């Protein structure tokens, strides 16, 4: 697909070993009470994952996107990825779990009490983003 000059590619490949390792890390982290929230990165990529997580908690966030291409960072639907929020006191233990299973980690940013979704390249108010996210539902129902 071509959108705003960015050419998309093939659907993401599923690497079962990576999925299995991520699942093991997430189960252990949940069992140990390390995570405050977790959300798979799938439909819509990182942008939708972060927004849905913010909507659920009525919180904001401030992130720095990895890589050089914001479009890829925000909308890639690569498999075997999750966004996790956790207290600072749990970070080292969570990183150790990931390292033990060979699960790569990218620290993106922080959750904020301010209701702003700050993607680094774009910021939206929480209510504005939620309204845009919900808008297709009434339109589809007529």
Where do the language-model regions lie?
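Charged, gly/pro-rich, cysteine-poor intrinsically disordered low-complexity regions
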Residues: 2, 18-19, 26
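Gly-rich Lys/Arg/Thr-decorated short loops/hinges at beta-loop-alpha junctions or inter-strand turns
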Residues: 1-13
């Amino acid at each position: 697909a071509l959108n705003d000059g960015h050419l998309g590619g093939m659907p993401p490949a599923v690497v079962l070993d990576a999925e299995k390792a991520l699942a093991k890390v997430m189960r252990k982290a949940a069992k140990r009470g390390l995570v405050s929230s977790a959300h798979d990165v799938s439909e819509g990529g990182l942008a939708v994952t972060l927004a849905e997580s913010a909507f659920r908690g009525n919180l904001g966030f401030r992130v720095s996107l990895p890589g050089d291409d914001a479009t890829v960072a925000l909308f890639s639907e690569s498999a075997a990825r999750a966004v996790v929020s956790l207290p600072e006191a749990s970070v080292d233990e969570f990183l150790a779990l990931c390292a033990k299973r060979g699960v790569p980690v990218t620290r993106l940013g922080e959750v904020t009490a301010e209701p702003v979704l700050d993607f680094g390249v774009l910021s939206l108010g929480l209510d504005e983003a939620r309204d845009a996210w919900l808008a297709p539902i009434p339109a589809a129902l007529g």
